[in-house]
Every structure is written in C-alpha cells, then in structure tokens.
UniProtKB/Swiss-Prot annotation:
One of its GO terms (biological process) is translation. This is Large ribosomal subunit protein bL32. HAMAP family: Ribosomal_bL32. Residues 7-16 have a biased composition (Basic residues). GO terms for cellular component: large ribosomal subunit. Residues 1-56 are annotated as: Disordered. Keywords: Ribonucleoprotein, Ribosomal protein. InterPro entries: Ribosomal_bL32 (IPR002677), Ribosomal_bL32_bact (IPR044957), Ribosomal_zn-bd (IPR011332). The lineage of its organism: Bacteria, Pseudomonadati, Pseudomonadota, Gammaproteobacteria, Oceanospirillales. Disulfide bonds: none annotated.
Amino acid sequence: MAVQQNRKTRSKRGMRRSHDALSAPTLSQDKETGTTHRRHHVAPDGFYRGRKVVDV
C-alpha cells in the first residue's frame, strides 16, 4: 500500500485545490422569446439563435 514520504504543506494543498472551485453556468436570453438558456445550448422551447431547430 502506498504511503506518502513527507507531509504536504498547507501551501501545496491549497495550490492543488485552486482548480476545484465551481463556477455558475453562463446564461443568455433568446432574442425571439426572451427565455433564459445556457450559452451554446438549445432553449427549452427548441429555438437556437433565433431559429427553430428542435420540434418540441
């Protein structure tokens, strides 16, 4: 079983965890209907960039 050779410092632990933060999803509003959706994703009503792309 692997056991660490030396204890990691608080600084090294913090540097490792610096990339673990979660970010809120970026939201956009549809120009046609004004609904909010994630960027580069189809809106719940099937529109993307002002065009109907999915039949809902």
